[in-house]
Amino acid sequence: MKKLIAIILALVMVLSLVACGNKADAPATEAPADEPVAVMTYAEYAAAELDTPVVIDCYVQAHQGWWFDGDAGHGKLTVYAADADGAYFLYELNVAEEDVAKFTTGAKIRVTGYKGMWDGQVEVMDGTFEFVEGDTYVAEPIDGNALLGSADMINYMNQLASFKGMTLESKTYKNDGGDDIWLTFSNNGVSCSFTVEVYFTGTDSDVYTTVDAMEIGDVADIEAFLYWYQDAADCHIAAITPAA
């Protein structure tokens, strides 16, 4: 009897060791990796929820000045971009200084970041990029006059628009000069806000010096990107021509 019990106990121990060995040899189960986000069309980007990852192919239309963010440890460049279906505002894209010269008008880039909103302005935040070889694209400005006073203007956010025969109603200098200039222009009694964004134009540009010299009541033709601020259009001026 004692011998039988000893045999049974020995078998139990052997089976236990085999089970433990199999368990130790089994590969660890890995958590499934996040699926990479596919390149989106403009319609897919527009429909994406805020604070979600986005990947877009787009074309550089213009950009603001490059600067180095010491806290982040890398350079930043804010870019106005577009494709044939819409436009994008790429806020503080991670860009090395040596790459800035390659951000020529029409250059194609692939941007990975997050869709965000600040004071009504929809933009790509925390973005990285890569240059994409191939075609180039420069968007023609849309008719801004047709959108003045229209709730439909927001559907064209970030696109370049052309405004004809705009009368200067007000002009305010941020920090008493040498910085942004805040403006109100109107056409046929409908007003719209515009800004000379110094990070975009600088103070020695034709845009800045032209606006600086304008007086209330002066008329000009304007090209501007449809930027949003405090839930209303506040267009960033890219070009301005005083009326003859």
Region locations from a protein language model:
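OB-fold single-stranded nucleic acid-binding module
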Residues: 31-244
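C-terminal motif of bacterial Sec signal peptides marking the signal peptidase cleavage site
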Residues: 16-19
